[in-house]
A protein has these predicted regions:
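Interfacial helix-loop-helix linkers and transmembrane-helix boundary segments
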Residues: 42-51, 84-85, 105-120, 254-262, ...
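Transmembrane helical segments that form the transport core of multi-pass membrane transport proteins
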Residues: 225-313
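Entry/N-cap segments of selected transmembrane alpha helices
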Residues: 110-132, 284-310, 362-366
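Alpha-helical membrane segments and immediately flanking helix-loop junctions
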Residues: 91-92, 99-105, 120-130, 134, ...
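Intrinsically disordered, low-complexity non-transmembrane regions of multi-pass membrane transporters
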Residues: 1-22, 28, 78, 191-220, ...
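Membrane-embedded hairpin module used as a gating/binding unit in multi-pass transport
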Residues: 177-253
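N-terminal alpha-helical transmembrane segments of multi-pass membrane transport
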Residues: 1-77
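Alpha-helical transmembrane segments
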Residues: 169-187, 295-305, 330-333
C-alpha cells in the first residue's frame, strides 16, 4: 500500500467517526430545537435558568457518533461522564435535592397568614387528575398516564421524580414538556385568566394578611411534614426535603445551611438536571407520535390546572363577605411554577390597576401548589406502585 492509499483509507476511516457521517434528519431537528430553547432563554428571557441548560443538553445529546466505537461518551453508555450525571435523574436523586433548595428559599408566610389560600393550590391539582383520565382514554398505561398527567402541576422536579419511578421510558419527553410549560407560563396563563374573569373581578383589592410569628413559621414545616407524609407516605422524598429545607430557613440557627441549600447546591443540581434531561431527548427516542401526544396532554393538563384555580377562587367568593373577597387573578398561582405564576398574577393585576399589588397574595397559593403537586405525585405513586 503506497502512502497515498494509506492516507485516503485512514481519512475515510476517520470520517466514519465524525458526526457528519452519522447525522440523521432527526438529530438535526433536535439540535435546532435545542438552539431554539437557548434563543428563547436569552433573547426572550423565558426562564433562562431552565432553558439554557436544557437547550444545550438537547444539542449535546443529539450530536451523533458511531455507536459501535466503544468511546463511552453517550448518555446511555455505562461509565461515561454523562451517564454518571444521568443517574441523578434516572434514580430520582436530583428532584429531592431541588425540593431541599426550594424549601430553603420559600417563605410560607403568605400561606400561614391566610390558610384558605391552600385550597386554591389544591384545586389546581384537578388538571393532573383530569389529564390522567384523558391519557388513559388515549391508550396509555396507568403508570405512563400518571407520569404525563403530573405535567399539569407545572413542576419539573416532581414530573421527573414520578416518571423515573413509573414510566422511565417516557421520562425525557415528560421532563422537557414540564419545563417547557413552566417557561411558557407568561404565554399560556394570561389568556386563560382574562377569559375567565371580568374587569370588575380583576381590580378586587385584597387586604394584607396578618403578621405571622416565628413560632408559627418554625412549627409549620414540622406539622406540614407529619400531616402530608402520614396521608401520602410515598411522597416522603419530596415533601421531606421540602420541609427540611424550610426548617433550616426558619429555625434562625442554621442560616448557613439554608443559604447553601438555596443557592450553591440548588444551582448545581439545576444545571446537572437541565443538562441531562436535555441530553435524554435523543432523536431516535424523542421524535415519535407518543411525544406529540405527551405534549398535547401536558398542555391540556396545564390549562385545566390554571382554569381550575381561577374558577375555584370565583366559587370561594360566592361564600365570602365583600370585604374578604379574593382576586381571581391569584387562582393561576395554584400551579407550582414558583414564583413565575405568582408574578403573572401580579403583572396582570397591575395592568388593570397600577396600585393593586397581588404578588404576596399570589405567593400563598403558589407555595401551596408546590405542596399539592408533591402530594398528588405521592398519591399516584402509592396507588400505582
Amino acid at each position: 500500500m503506497d502512502l497515498g492509499q494509506f492516507i485516503i483509507q485512514n481519512f475515510h476511516e476517520f470520517l466514519t467517526y465524525t458526526a457528519f457521517a452519522n447525522a440523521t434528519v432527526g438529530n438535526l431537528i433536535r439540535i435546532a430545537v435545542g438552539a431554539f430553547f437557548i434563543w428563547l432563554a436569552i433573547k426572550k428571557d423565558f426562564e433562562p435558568l431552565l432553558l439554557v441548560p436544557i437547550g444545550l443538553g438537547i444539542i449535546l445529546g443529539n450530536i451523533p457518533f458511531r455507536a459501535d466505537a466503544g468511546l463511552e461518551i453517550g448518555l446511555y453508555e455505562d461509565n461515561s461522564v454523562l451517564n454518571i450525571f444521568y443517574q441523578g435523574v434516572r434514580q430520582g436523586w436530583y428532584p429531592p435535592l431541588i425540593f431541599l433548595g426550594i424549601g430553603a428559599m420559600t417563605d410560607f408566610t403568605a400561606l400561614l397568614a391566610n390558610p384558605k389560600l391552600m385550597l386554591i393550590g389544591a384545586s389546581a391539582q384537578f388538571g393532573i387528575f383530569g389529564a390522567y383520565m384523558v391519557a388513559l382514554a388515549m391508550g396509555f398505561e396507568p403508570s405512563q398516564a400518571a407520569g404525563i398527567a403530573i405535567i399539569g402541576g407545572a413542576d419539573g422536579p416532581t414530573a421527573i421524580f414520578l416518571s423515573s419511578k413509573l414510566s422511565p421510558n417516557l421520562m425525557g419527553a415528560i421532563a422537557v414538556c414540564a419545563y417547557s410549560y413552566m417557561a411558557l407560563v407568561p404565554v399560556i396563563q394570561p389568556f386563560i385568566m382574562r377569559l375567565l374573569t371580568t374587569k370588575k373581578e380583576r381590580v378586587i383589592k385584597m387586604k394584607p394578611g396578618r403578621e405571622v410569628s416565628q413560632t408559627e413559621r418554625i412549627l409549620f414545616p414540622i406539622i406540614g411534614l407529619l400531616l402530608t407524609t402520614f396521608i401520602v407516605p410515598s411522597g416522603l422524598p419530596l415533601l421531606g426535603m421540602l420541609f427540611f429545607g424550610n426548617l433550616l430557613k426558619e429555625s434562625g440557627k442554621t442560616t448557613r445551611l439554608a443559604k447553601t441549600a438555596g443557592t450553591a447546591l440548588n444551582d448545581i443540581v439545576v444545571m446537572l438536571l437541565g443538562l441531562t434531561v436535555g441530553c435524554s431527548t435523543q432523536a431516535s427516542e424523542f421524535l415519535t407520535f407518543n411525544t406529540i401526544k405527551i405534549f398535547a396532554l401536558g398542555a391540556m393538563a396545564f390549562m385545566i390546572a390554571t382554569a381550575s384555580g381561577v374558577c375555584f377562587v370565583k366559587l370561594m367568593n360566592l361564600f365570602l363577605p365583600e370585604s374578604k373577597k379574593l382576586n381571581p387573578l391569584i387562582g393561576n398561582a395554584g400551579v407550582s411554577a414558583v414564583p413565575m405564576a405568582a408574578r403573572i398574577s401580579n403583572n396582570l393585576g397591575l395592568e388593570y390597576d397600577r396600585h393593586n399589588f397581588l404578588l404576596m397574595h399570589a405567593m400563598g397559593p403558589n407555595v401551596a401548589g408546590v405542596i399539592g403537586s408533591a402530594v398528588a405525585a405521592g398519591a399516584l405513586l402509592g396507588f400505582l406502585s
